[in-house]
């Protein structure tokens, strides 16, 4: 199956993505991460109002194969979390870049936050180098 990496997103090497719209960031996990994890069974996310710091774990996702920490690509305050994904994490795989988003965050410094992220092209190249996808 050909994995999708939308061009309008930025990616982390830890496989989270970000869609930045002004000062609001939508955060989720990439189709590649979902494929590697397999069937998702548990998702832990911060509460609305919690602060996130780029590079510090904000939650975790578990599958039948593994458990992984989640890392925010930006610093800011959680303004929404996808309750449907917490209740039924297995459906994240159905639409990871649309309905499968995890958090919405009000970003502190939108102009500076994307500095260490990857374009879709660079993310795919990283994966091809590591995994030969």
UniProtKB/Swiss-Prot annotation:
This is Glycine cleavage system H protein. The lineage of its organism: Bacteria, Bacillati, Cyanobacteriota, Cyanophyceae, Oscillatoriophycideae. It holds the Pfam family GCV_H. It comes from the Bacteria. One of its GO terms (biological process) is glycine decarboxylation via glycine cleavage system. The modification N6-lipoyllysine is found at residue 65. The glycine cleavage system is composed of four proteins: P, T, L and H. Belongs to the GcvH family. GO terms for cellular component: cytosol; glycine cleavage complex. SUPFAM superfamilies: Single hybrid motif. It comes from Crocosphaera subtropica (strain ATCC 51142 / BH68). Binds 1 lipoyl cofactor covalently. NCBIfam families: gcvH (TIGR00527), PRK01202.1 (NF002270). Its cofactor is (R)-lipoate. Keywords: Lipoyl. The gene is gcvH. Residues 24-106 form the Lipoyl-binding domain. The glycine cleavage system catalyzes the degradation of glycine. The H protein shuttles the methylamine group of glycine from the P protein to the T protein.
């Amino acid at each position: 199956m050909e994995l999708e990496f939308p061009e309008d997103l930025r990616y982390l090497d830890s496989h989270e993505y970000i869609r930045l719209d002004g000062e609001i960031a939508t955060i989720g996990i990439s189709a590649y991460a979902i494929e590697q994890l397999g069937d998702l069974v548990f998702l832990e996310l911060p509460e609305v109002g919690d602060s996130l710091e780029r590079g510090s774990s904000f939650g975790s996702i578990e599958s039948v194969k593994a458990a992984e920490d989640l890392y925010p690509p930006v610093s800011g305050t959680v303004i929404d979390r996808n309750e449907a994904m917490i209740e039924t994490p297995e459906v994240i795989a159905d639409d990871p870049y649309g309905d499968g988003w995890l958090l919405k965050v009000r970003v502190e410094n939108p102009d500076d936050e994307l500095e260490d992220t990857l374009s879709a092209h660079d993310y795919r190249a990283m994966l091809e180098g590591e995994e030969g996808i």
